[in-house]
């Protein structure tokens, strides 16, 4: 029988949900930013504030990291991810009314392209940030 993947946004053990500690630290930073700035701003404002919060908390990150997309060994495109945290977790930010499935698909593509396991999709345009966070597992 194939093992079940944990559902998104549920409490899981470290074995079920890898990199739980770092993702919780990232989410804590995002909650801090959201609690001060609130919803309704442009994505780049949240990106700048979150970058500053990562620095304050000594979290290693790369911002607007370029990744390469390949098809059968041929480079077919390049994209930029909002944040790569400690070379382990991809964080994509949004400031939209609704998180569409295409944003989730995009993050999963980035996870596959970089061979990373965990991604966070964070939408700051919500009243309670907890409602705007999705954890995706590759």
Predicted region positions:
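A short, surface-exposed helix-loop junction/capping segment
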Residues: 26-36
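Nucleic-acid nuclease catalytic cores
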Residues: 94-138
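Conserved catalytic cores of phosphodiester-cleaving nucleases, focusing on short active-site segments
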Residues: 38, 83-99, 110
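Nuclease catalytic cores
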Residues: 19-24, 39-43, 47, 51
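A short acidic/basic microdomain associated with nuclease active sites
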Residues: 55-70
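Intrinsic disorder/low-complexity segments
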Residues: 1-21
């Amino acid at each position: 029988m194939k093992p079940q993947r944990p559902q998104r946004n549920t409490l899981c053990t470290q074995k079920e949900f890898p990199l739980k500690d770092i993702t919780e630290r990232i989410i804590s930073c995002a909650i801090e930013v959201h609690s001060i700035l609130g919803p309704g701003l442009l994505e780049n404002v949240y990106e700048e504030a979150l970058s500053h919060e990562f620095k304050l908390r000594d979290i290693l990150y790369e911002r607007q990291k370029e990744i390469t997309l390949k098809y059968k060994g041929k480079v077919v495109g390049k994209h930029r991810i909002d944040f790569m945290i400690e070379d382990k977790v991809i964080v994509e930010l949004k400031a939209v009314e609704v998180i569409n499935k295409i944003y989730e698909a995009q993050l999963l593509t980035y996870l596959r392209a970089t061979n990373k396991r965990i991604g966070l999709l964070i939408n700051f345009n919500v009243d309670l940030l907890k409602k705007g966070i999705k954890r995706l597992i590759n």
